Amino acid sequence: MTQFKEETMLVHPVLIPGSGTRSWTVLGDDDVPVVPVGRFLAYLTDIGRSPNTVKAYAHDMKDLWQFLGFRGLDWREARLEDIGEFVAWLQLPPAGRSGVVTVLTSSVPEVSAATVNRKLAAVSSFYAHQARNDEGPGDLLAAWRTGGRGGWKPFLHHVSRGKPYRGRAITLKAPKKLPRILTVAETQAVLDACTRLRDRFFFALMHETGCRAGEVLGLRHEDIAAAEQEITVMPRENANGARAKSGARTVPVAPELIRLYADYLHEEYGGIDSDYVFVNIWAEPKGQAWSYQAAYDLVLRLRARTGLDFDPHWLRHSAATRWLRDGVSIEVASKLLGHSSVTTTSAVYGHLTVEDARAALEKAGWLTGREVTW
């Protein structure tokens, strides 16, 4: 097997022949693509995985190929024990990965357990894909299990609870990170810091609907039904690269949001000829669909104005948390968020803060009155 040096391996964008769809590949020595990795990444693109997912998997496969190269291993000969060594290798600082420099073991790994698990998911998916094509050592990381997976259980779950499901043989225990949310006051501060209606509408839309930034950037005027007070998120190819991660869904909105949209069209959008809701108005090229970079630049300006080091995705987390706290069922919240499964919604948002616990106890009368005194 060719032993790739770290500096010679690159993740590089490519266009899929025929469709012209943008994807990613990994280049080895002399800018030669790593064929099995390229085929795997092209497959992910063909089945509709998001560009960000494909790019992340490309970096994960680059890490795997570097590790195999340093060990002198061919990917087809790798064993489960080798993947275990790969996990340990990932947690070394870059200077220690080549084996040329010996580094002291640190109590703080180079990458988090969550990041390692994501890379293992990519490796597992790669070997499963190769196994389906009768190549490689088989489904290397697969571990078939029975019993419950934990979390939310659907109606009639008991009917299939003994059915085996595919798990992963290696998974690091990672601390669960609660989603970051904005308080009502913080959300208001972000909105009030917007000096333009377009910018205010952008964040108000995320706050109201729980949509992802990419879904909002991809909105067309035809997706907003003003009379019905509904917004439809549609998966489609967009000129700005924005993408809806899930299938089509329709989200009801408040009349105030529709009025803000109308004000934006009347006072700022004017005669611009574009299908896109969010476009360049003051920057060139005027009328071009707003890009991720333009939205991120706005976030940086708002961080400076408000002193809040926030991320747009926090507005989505805030919407979901608000719905569940206000009694919206988890099934409805899951549909509004565009999750493929209620289990996903439960895993991400099925948490209680101290404030939630206090409110529940007060509602039950535990903190407002006592049957006994002490």
Indicate where each model-derived feature is located.
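Active-site/catalytic core of tyrosine-dependent DNA strand-transfer enzymes
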Residues: A254-G307
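Short, polar N-cap/turn motifs at the start of nucleic acid-interacting alpha helices
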Residues: I224-A226, L308-D309, V328-V348
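Conserved tyrosine-mediated DNA breakage-rejoining catalytic core shared by Y-recombinases
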Residues: G214, G218-R259
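Short basic/aromatic active-site micro-motif
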Residues: L308-G327
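Basic, Lys/Arg- and aromatic-enriched nucleic-acid-binding interface segment
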Residues: A174-A213, L217, I272
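N-terminal core-binding DNA-recognition domain of tyrosine recombinases/integrases
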Residues: V37-N52, K62-H157, A189
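C-terminal secondary-structure termini that scaffold catalytic or DNA-interacting sites
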Residues: M1-V11, A364-W374
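Short, charged phosphate-coordinating catalytic segments
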Residues: N133-P137, M206-Q229, E331
